[in-house]
Amino acid sequence: MRRALAWLLPLLVAGCSSLDEGQAGVVGIEVQVPGPDTLEVGESIQLGARPLDKNGDSASAAVTWVSVDPTASIDPSTGVLTGLSVGTARIQATVGSLGSSLISFAIVPRADTLQIAGDSIFTASVTASPLPNFTTVVFSFSPLGPVPTHGVVYAITSPDPLVSPAPVVLSTNGQVTDTVPTGTDGTAVTSLALTPGAVPPESVVVTISSTRIRGVVVPGSGQHFILHFTP
């Protein structure tokens, strides 16, 4: 939870002996923002604000919310913020003439689907180098197009990933699981690498998954790549 304080200008210059009070004795606004400060198009989050009196206690006053940019809308009374279009959205909480500092959010494309790009089943020799690429793409329907800089999880699920040392790993990090970010075209790519000295498995299954910013599973998660090895 991110918090920001907004104080009336007279408070900054009046010294400790006196405070100029605004509406209903409010001299400051404490704003609560659930992290992260990134919002997908169509996603809504609840913001909170607490008017403060000169003693730092809660003051009884209505807070009005304002969206400065057209990239997001916010309910003036409830503080529910909704992403509308890609870009930066600046939000402010107000009580009378007192306004909080502008709070910025990055509005990004919504991750609507995770797809396998091209083949999902491959056959390769154990001596082949490099091994085939496993390519996925994260796509958005709002706005229509690829989703860049979004994490795709590749996880070796067969052979048993708990066996150590693993006979095969992902080439991007040398582990059995890796989160690979998508590029500007929405694609994420990895491949396999055999562990030197280990007995190659007959086949390898790699499961893909992805989540949205606040944990919702992206449709298409759970698909598999399969690589069969030949001598």
Q: PLM features: residue spans?
A:
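Extracytoplasmic soluble-region selector
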Residues: S17-P231
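C-terminal motif of bacterial Sec signal peptides marking the signal peptidase cleavage site
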Residues: L12-G15
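Sec-dependent signal peptide recognition
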Residues: R2-P10
